[in-house]
């Protein structure tokens, strides 16, 4: 079925009420102007697409969690408005000549919201906890293995947590030993997994830690209020005990979970909220509105194939067929319609340049998996013959928001139509549940995504190594593992050689049809002119709220 016909089907079957209710009047007063602040209080109001899955820095794995962790906590450094590390709990650091020892000097005026000082011991505890296998952290091993000395051995149970290469020399000096020189380590320290934790508080709370506002401590710009693990609304309130509280202009930021696009639009137009994401069916109506903006990002969406849950998906030719059997250009142009672009590789466009030439990595690596129906059918026929069947049934797991619903229905229809004998059943669940099913490897086909945690291809490529804490697919390649691991070991100081390995590894990943790239996302939004100082990061926490202010 052609994309336009499928889109029309979706429009009539799924969002007819949205289209009927939207006027798209371009002459209206800009939305958001009706949200009035008192002279005593500055407030901005936002929507969130889902509940916050986790406020535990060791257990968080998703975009929403890291956004709110970054707002309420602070690590050694924080990304500024130019996406450069700026002083956080650390005021400065020194690096040894061999690049293996980093010594951080911490400020002495940083406090937790219970009045305790933030010390080097808090970082030692948090980092040890993140790699301790008893914690069952996904991100701890992913972010620290191969970077901090002994992190990998600890996570494998081959060394005790106190052998991690991090120690406190007094209360305000933190010394970190690395496995290999890591030039981007300063940037890593801005990420949520590296945030400190107050050991006494965490241990007192036990299993209740990070399950509600009352079971959290903050050391960052804001304190989260009126939140629990099942909340559909919460607030970020200015943390008056934050060491840099004078810089924080906002008194409060409010957030509400709204999944229905028409409800979100109504809230924006009546001035109840100051920002909302537009779904594809609304973009054309509002693209000339003064508040309309396209916010490009570096998230890449892909199909994950669980090779352990399906005989068909264990077959490389079947996976290769699925990867090529849906029209990605039509998907981004007509189903998403928000500035997103088709992804034909893993590393996003305009993310990182090749050392020496300065060319964009994506351009040099090229299109590795394009829509190719002829090739898809050939791979499909070969795969079916190899597994001895003429039909395959797959369950397609995805989040339950409206945009994702439109997307997965389109992809499922394309796959079922283009590959004879294939039946795809869609299973949509809340994001928190999808993440749990993902880590339990309780799925067959899944729409997933990844946003970079730091500015290096390793943040994407390490996902698919055999022992990665995020590789819940069953994919394993010793050749791929070595290519990626060498970039942080034997080739750590040879920039050109590292990137050659990344190029070769990305090519191998798609020759093996480990995953199927779908698109690199953008956000089409309506943003009130009231908002200023809210920065969008290309890696790490998507939104930075420390410098938020109201434009009167």
Kindly label every feature range from the protein language model:
Residues 138-200:
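Surface-exposed binding/hinge segments that line
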Residues 239-285:
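Ligand-site clamp/hinge motif
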Residues 368-369, 421-434, 461-528, 552:
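Extracytoplasmic/peripheral linker and loop segments enriched in polar/acidic and small residues
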């Amino acid at each position: 079925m052609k994309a336009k016909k499928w889109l029309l089907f979706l429009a009539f079957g799924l969002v007819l009420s949205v289209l009927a209710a939207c006027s798209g009047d371009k002459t209206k007063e800009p939305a958001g102007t009706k949200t009035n602040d008192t002279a005593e209080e500055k407030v901005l109001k936002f929507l969130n697409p889902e509940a916050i899955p986790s406020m535990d820095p060791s257990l968080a794995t998703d975009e929403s969690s890291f956004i709110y962790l970054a707002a309420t906590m602070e690590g050694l450094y924080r990304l500024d408005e130019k996406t450069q590390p700026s002083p956080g709990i650390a005021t400065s650091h020194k690096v040894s000549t061999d690049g293996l020892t980093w010594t951080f000097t911490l400020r002495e005026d940083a406090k937790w919201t219970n009045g305790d000082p933030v010390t080097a011991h808090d970082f030692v505890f948090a980092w040890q906890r993140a790699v301790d296998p008893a914690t069952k952290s996904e991100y701890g091993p992913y972010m620290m293995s191969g970077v901090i000395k002994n992190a990998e051995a600890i996570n494998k149970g081959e060394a005790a947590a106190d052998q991690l290469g991090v120690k406190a020399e007094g209360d305000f000096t933190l010394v970190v030993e690395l496995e290999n020189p890591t030039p981007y380590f300063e940037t890593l320290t801005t990420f949520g997994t590296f945030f400190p934790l107050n050991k006494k508080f965490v241990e007192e709370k036990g299993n209740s830690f990070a399950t509600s506002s009352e079971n959290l401590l903050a050391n960052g710009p804001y304190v989260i209020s009126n939140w629990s693990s099942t909340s559909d609304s919460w607030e970020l309130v200015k943390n008056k005990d934050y060491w840099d509280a004078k810089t924080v202009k906002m008194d409060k930021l409010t957030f509400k979970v709204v999944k229905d696009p028409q409800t979100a639009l109504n809230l924006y137009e009546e001035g109840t909220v100051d920002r909302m994401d537009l779904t594809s069916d609304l973009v054309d109506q509002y693209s000339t509105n003064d508040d309309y903006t396209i916010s490009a990002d570096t998230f890449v969406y892909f199909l994950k194939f669980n090779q352990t849950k399906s005989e068909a998906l264990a077959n490389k030719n079947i996976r290769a067929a699925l990867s090529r059997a849906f029209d990605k250009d039509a998907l981004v142009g007509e189903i998403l319609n928000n500035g997103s672009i088709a992804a034909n590789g893993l590393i996003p466009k305009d993310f990182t340049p090749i050392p020496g030439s300065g060319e964009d990595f994506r351009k040099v690596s090229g299109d590795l998996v394009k829509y190719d129906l002829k090739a898809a059918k050939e791979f499909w026929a070969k795969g079916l013959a190899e597994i001895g069947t003429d039909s395959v049934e797959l369950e397609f797991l995805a989040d339950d928001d409206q945009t994702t619903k439109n997307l997965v229905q389109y992809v499922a229809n394309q796959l079922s139509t283009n590959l004879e004998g294939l039946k795809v059943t869609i299973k949509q669940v809340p994001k928190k549940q999808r993440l749990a099913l993902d880590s339990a490897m309780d799925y067959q086909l899944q729409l997933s995504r990844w946003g970079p945690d730091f500015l290096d291809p390793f943040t994407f490529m390490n996902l698919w190594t055999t022992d990665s804490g995020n590789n819940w697919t069953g994919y394993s390649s010793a050749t791929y593992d070595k290519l990626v691991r060498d970039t942080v070991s034997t080739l750590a100081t040879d920039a050109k050689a590292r990137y050659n390995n990344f190029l070769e590894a990305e090519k191998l990943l798609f020759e093996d049809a480990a995953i199927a790239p779908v698109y690199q996302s953008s956000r089409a939004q309506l943003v009130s002119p009231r908002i200023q100082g809210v920065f969008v990061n290309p890696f790490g926490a998507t939104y930075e709220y420390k410098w938020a202010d109201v434009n009167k």
